[in-house]
Amino acid sequence: ALSIASLRTHVDFFSIGTNDLTQYTMAAGRENPSVSEYFIDDHPAILRLIELVVMESGTKPGSICGELAGRVDVIPKLLRSGIRSLSVASALVPDVKFAVRKIKVEDSINHVGIEK
């Protein structure tokens, strides 16, 4: 996530896997009961890393995959960060589409709402 500027000339797009990003950033695995409480995929640090990837990616399109992409409560923040593609389980598609359609894109550009 922090090296996207040096990688962007070598890729056509980027995809952020939020499960792995969260696990490595928070040093906590979802399946490990002794640390799973620290697996917080909508933590401000995770949202800031997503925003940094989008900002540093230039004109390369970006996508989010992982459990976070299907959380309708977080979708507005993801869109505000500049993400325009969400990869979710097929069962979540109707709810995600409904959540996205409720948001005005012009109100959701380049601001996650966290302090920098």
How would you label these PLM feature ranges?
Residues 1-116:
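Conserved alpha/beta-domain cores
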